[in-house]
Amino acid sequence: MSGRFITLEGGEGAGKSSNLVWLAEALRAEGKTVMVSREPGGTALAESIREVLLAPSNEVMADDTELLLVFAARAQHLEQKIRPALARGEWVLCDRFLDATWAYQGAGRGLDSAAIAALEALVIRDTRPDMTILFDVPVEVGMARAGKRAALDRIEQEDRAFFDRIRQCYLARAAQEPNRFRTVDASQPLESVQQQLARIVEEMQAWP
């Protein structure tokens, strides 16, 4: 029995993390065995890489270094956690995955798409999301929400133009792959967002 792989994507302040918990509980209520994880992270080694990636003290990090660290964390995450869970028939919910790399390192940093594609082929292979839920929010709203946090990490400290590029990349990818993406208006109040998610959960129940 094979499981299902669902990823949650979006810019800063989109509310992915809090709604990930709601979504996991909704699926468990339907009798699913759910594993929740995140990227970068998900394993002890990958979480250590996450700390390096996000530490404000590492502001001089080269963009290529950032890209390689992201894929190093992902390789460990896939091998140690995601693939075994899917093989057990579990539903894997992951806060960010490959689309985030195309948005942040590709569009945000302007890194070469051929380099990202080569690393994708090496690391991802055939482990692809069954569905990706995009939490879309205007950049100014997301930045205002993120700004309320105790301290901004290295990525959150980027400028408005950086996050504009990220949002446009996400929307473009959603338009290119409508069968995989479901876009949620994350600028709405939490109750409205969860109503949108409830409809997506209903759709998942129809999966064979």
From Swiss-Prot:
MF GO annotations: ATP binding; dTMP kinase activity
Uppermost EC category: transferase
EC number(s) per entry: 2.7.4.9
GO terms under biological process: dTDP biosynthetic process; dTTP biosynthetic process; dUDP biosynthetic process
Binding residues for ATP: G10, G11, E12, G13, A14, G15, K16, S17
A GO cellular-component term linked to this record: cytosol
InterPro entries reported in the protein's UniProt record: P-loop_NTPase (IPR027417), Thymidylate_kin-like_dom (IPR039430), Thymidylate_kinase (IPR018094)
Pfam families listed in its UniProt record: Thymidylate_kin
UniProt keyword annotations, A-Z: ATP-binding, Kinase, Nucleotide biosynthesis, Nucleotide-binding, Transferase
Catalytic reaction annotation: dTMP + ATP = dTDP + ADP
Gene3D superfamilies per record: P-loop containing nucleotide triphosphate hydrolases
Top-level taxon: Bacteria
Family: Belongs to the thymidylate kinase family.
Task of the protein: Phosphorylation of dTMP to form dTDP in both de novo and salvage pathways of dTTP synthesis.
Protein's recorded name: Thymidylate kinase
Organism of derivation: Alcanivorax borkumensis (strain ATCC 700651 / DSM 11573 / NCIMB 13689 / SK2)
